[in-house]
A protein has these predicted regions:
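Secretory targeting and sorting signals
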Residues: 1-26
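Boundary/entry segment of secreted carbohydrate-active catalytic domains
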Residues: 31-80
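Aromatic-lined carbohydrate-recognition surfaces of secreted/lumenal glycan-active proteins
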Residues: 52-57, 162-163, 189-218, 268-271, ...
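Acidic-and-aromatic substrate-binding clefts and catalytic sites of carbohydrate-active enzymes
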Residues: 55-67, 85-98, 168-173, 211-220, ...
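Short, acidic/polar
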Residues: 57-73, 140-150, 216-228, 253, ...
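Substrate-binding cleft and catalytic face of glycoside hydrolase catalytic domains
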Residues: 72-90, 98-211
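Aromatic- and acid-rich polysaccharide-binding/catalytic face
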Residues: 74-81, 165, 198-208, 221-248, ...
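Active-site clefts of carbohydrate-active enzymes
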Residues: 118, 203-211, 242-243, 260-292, ...
Length: 352
């Protein structure tokens, strides 16, 4: 809860700044006909005390349409790739913060909070770490040094950090990352302690996918965070990535969020997108609008759910088609940056 007051203050500012209302949203006849009163997702979300964010590819901020939607519709931005290890420390001790700094600058100019993603992850991990042949003590030092430099660089600028990302297999066993196999599970507690020392301001999260419903993996996550809390490890939040499939929002999403909230943690929907088999059609898009609304409603029903980040603005920029051939249309804006029915679904569910 360390940054809660700051985030709330930003939310209040956001709600009061008509200039940040989206011209695009106001011109949308469908939205006018719906009777929605909020001019943007960020206004609607702020009015209900939550943030609404998007992942940003900072290379696309030079596209005015992209930048305008990012600025006007969202109150939080996450670096899609720019704060990951392969970008920030491509070789040992050589740091590159240019993309992250651009994002922080964009966020400060548009009254966004910044969500840091991610300090320790098995993917987008440079070869010098993955294949460095370090022993446990050495790798732990490499990890702590990385956290110290990266979280230290951005200290005071970020509302959240995903300290560790995707530490589990889907069956709830520990993913056999180089950190797990070399250091053991204690690398997770070590990472949180290092992040807390480097940035005492950010809320510190553990983030994963396929943990939205109650299942073996979310049970393992629950057990792990319970144990971290028992050990006094500085953990503040759980991120449910929420890369979902059309028509398959887990019915127990709210119940699952609530059990983490009951541990005293914040819960964040960190990477929401809802993919479908292509081509999209009006029936699928209507279902997608219901699905997005269902996720927002579940978050709104859990006071500890502080916000929702969608993973990218438009279908044009989404990671989905590259990884799931034949699937896509997962975002809230289409390939031409026009809002889809999912936009109204989210807006209405936020109370707009
Ligand atoms: O930067 C290189 C560029 O130099 C090279 O020319 C180009 C050629 O393919 O690749 C570029 O790197 C790509 C990188 O995105 C930056 O654009 C990688 O190939 C590509 O694999 C990478 O994809 C990212 C993916 O994480 C990597 O796992 C996606 O953009 C990003 O949306 C995705 O995000 C993850 C979250 O971090 C964690 N949760 C799952 C989520 C979706 O996979």
């Amino acid at each position: 809860m360390r940054r809660a007051a700051v985030v709330a203050a930003v939310g209040a500012l956001v709600a009061g700044f008509a200039v940040y209302g989206s011209a695009q949203a106001q011109e949308d006849p469908a939205r006018d006909a719906s009777g929605a009163t909020a001019a943007s997702l960020r206004e609607a979300a702020a009015a209900s005390g939550t943030f609404v964010g998007t992942a940003i590819n900072d290379g696309l901020l030079s596209n005015p349409t992209y930048a305008n939607i990012a600025a006007s519709e969202f109150s939080s931005v996450t670096a899609e790739n720019a704060m990951k290890w392969d970008t920030t420390e491509p070789s040992r001790g050589n740091f590159n913060f240019s993309g992250g700094d651009r994002l922080v600058d964009f966020a400060n100019r548009n009254l966004h909070q910044v969500y840091g993603h991610t300090l320790v992850w098995h993917s987008q991990l440079p070869g010098w770490v993955q294949n460095g042949g370090f022993n446990a003590e050495q790798l732990n030092q490499v990890m702590v040094d990385h956290i110290d430099a990266v979280a230290g660089h951005f200290s005071g600028e970020l509302a959240y950090w995903d300290v560790v990302n995707e530490v589990f297999n889907d069956d709830g066993s520990m993913r056999q990352s180089v950190f797990q196999t070399t250091i053991g599970t204690e690398y997770i507690a070590n990472a949180f302690r290092a992040a807390d020392a480097a940035d005492p301001w950010a809320n510190l999260c553990i983030n994963d996918y396929n943990v939205e419903g109650i299942n073996a993996k979310s049970d393992a996550l629950y057990d792990l965070v319970s144990s971290l809390l028992d050990q006094g490890v500085p953990i503040d939040c759980v991120g449910l990535q929420s890369h979902l499939i059309l028509g398959q929002v887990p019915g127990d999403l709210q119940e699952n969020m609530q059990r983490f909230a009951d541990l005293g943690l914040e819960v964040i929907i960190t990477e929401l997108d809802i993919r479908m088999d292509l081509p999209a059609d009006s029936g699928k898009l209507a279902q997608q609008a219901e699905d997005y609304a269902e996720v927002v409603t579940a978050c709104m029903n859990v006071p500890a759910c502080e916000g929702i980040t969608v993973w990218g603005i438009s279908d044009r920029d989404s990671w989905v088609p590259g990884v799931f051939p034949g699937q896509g249309a997962a975002c809230v804006w289409d390939e031409s940056y026009q809002p889809k029915p999912a936009y109204d679904g989210m807006l209405t569910a936020f109370g707009g």
